Regions:
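A structural signal for conserved, well-ordered secondary-structure elements
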Residues: 1-336
Length: 336
């Protein structure tokens, strides 16, 4: 039988090597490239009737007083623009007609170029396909709520797993081990986006937060499947040694985890290649998170649980503090 648990230090080393580049990137400003949801600003999209390049659009926006604008192509002659906040409503003076808003000025100026705009059905139009603005106050609130959501989700997961495995000795360790794997996955995703932001200008937006929360759920679900099989093998009393129980459980669930994840990854890849640009950030988070979540649920969560149960963590802590090693008796499973 394949012995996985004896190689757990190699799995830890592999995870460490995966995490380090992202951690280094996060230490170099800018850590992440935030979208307008977190920095305030305006985003709008439009479709030109004639062939147009991003450099031409950038020049038009620069002439309109927005040299900081970032332009992305979302399709043939289709563009997504992100710039500083543009007023979206007209100003009504005490006397006379309403003054044009910032949006009206930019929209009308761009619509006069390159054959004008086309709507989603391909008909001529004078309006943007999409337009949205986020103020500085709203962007701060979104960032704060996103951080709170991740923290509450982690706490709720720990409590739920601890309660679900309450009949198993040291049930809190199961919950903490799942959170360790979860943090491993989140750190890899955030680190990857930090690197992608520096190289390819990939931004972090609300779709990123949605994807991270989805990855959190997927990672914990996979870990629970492995933990549940460990609990079953422990309860049957057929395996007297805890490392053997963990190893046997991993071999039983590994095929199921890999097959489920591969099916999901193929679906994500299809959407990433054929889907729209608006959800590309979400799909990229899911692609990275599902891949790392499959690995961590098998090789991090269960291995960390075994390391803790075997007393390796207290021994390591004593070694760091310079204390003499304390003998820890072997962990034996209780008879049913």
């Amino acid at each position: 039988m394949l012995d996985l648990v004896s190689k757990r230090n190699w799995f830890y080393l592999f995870s460490f090597l995966l995490v380090i580049p992202g951690v280094i990137s996060l230490m170099i400003p800018p850590r992440l490239r935030p979208g307008i949801e977190f920095t305030s600003g305006t985003t709008f999209s439009f479709h030109y009737a004639q062939d147009t390049t991003t450099s031409q659009v950038k020049q038009l926006l620069s002439d309109l007083g927005h040299p900081e604008a970032r332009v992305q192509t979302t399709g043939p002659n289709q563009f997504l623009v992100q710039t500083s906040e543009i007023e979206g409503s007209a100003t009504t003076p005490p006397v006379g007609p309403a003054l044009p808003s910032g949006r009206d000025v930019v929209e009308s100026a761009l619509a006069r170029e390159h054959g004008g705009f086309l709507d989603t059905q391909g008909n001529p139009t004078t309006q943007f396909t999409e337009f949205s603005s986020v103020s500085a106050a709203v962007s701060k609130q979104i960032g704060r709520n996103a951080a709170i959501a991740v923290l509450w989700a982690s706490l709720a997961i720990t409590l739920y797993i601890t309660w679900s495995f309450r009949n198993v000795p040291n049930s809190l360790r199961y919950g903490v081990s799942a959170i360790v794997a979860l943090l491993h996955d989140v750190l890899l995703v955030v680190g990857a986006f930090s690197i992608l932001g520096k190289i390819f200008d990939v931004e972090v937006n609300t779709f990123f937060i949605t994807g991270v929360l989805t990855v959190v759920g997927f990672s914990v679900h996979d870990s629970i499947v492995v933990f549940d099989r460990i609990r079953e093998n422990v309860g049957r009393g057929l395996i007297r040694n805890f490392p053997e129980a963990v190893n046997h459980s991993l071999l039983q669930t590994m095929g199921r985890s890999f097959n489920t994840s591969l099916t999901l990854i193929f679906s994500i890849l299809a959407l990433l290649l054929l889907g729209g640009g608006s959800i590309r950030t979400l799909l990229l988070v899911l692609l990275i998170g599902v891949s790392t979540g499959t690995y961590s649920s098998v090789f991090i969560a269960s291995m960390f649980l075994l390391t803790w149960q075997q007393g390796d963590i207290p021994r390591l802590w004593r070694r760091i503090r310079g204390l003499p090693p304390k003998p820890v008796p072997g962990v034996q499973l209780p008879a049913e």
